[in-house]
């Protein structure tokens, strides 16, 4: 059976956040993080529907008043002890699209132009044999564990950071994958995901108060090199 190109964008927002309380509705731009993300997605071409999945009545009200689908998340899927893959199975049951795009409110610098680019690239890459698309940013820095250096040598063998092996930071900004494959993988992207590279501003991801303050500063700046 041939898949359609219908895409459901899912904004997953939990009411409780241990590291940064109420992080999904913190003030951002001209509104709050959740509403900011909804307004960004409304400008994206090619979306069949936008869903906010939350256990928070306050967040669902924001989504509903903004004119998107607001679906109350069952209590068991708001519990962090429940495997992420089980929550994804539930998501696959509530979406109409043949493809799911994960769109986190905590990635506020992922702008409409980036979503549009990702969607076009995603369908191209599916034809080339990739199974999904994720956003990553290049990551070249010195890494250590408790035993010492992981990706560099000390002494005369030391290299400048730009000479280190290229690693990739998975940003959580955009994930795109076929709905039925997500159900099969119990994950929101697959083993042959195409890595769409984005810059540090676009990769901003809010997990704690430091991330939040940095994201506000990055959003306020004019991006000198947007991924277009």
Functional labels for PLM-detected ranges:
Residues 3-53:
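N-terminal glycine-rich phosphate-binding loop and ensuing alpha1 helix
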Residues 57-101, 113-117:
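Short phosphate-binding loop-to-helix
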Residues 103-105:
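Active-site acidic Asp-centered loop
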Residues 108-200:
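Conserved core of the sugar-phosphate nucleotidyltransferase
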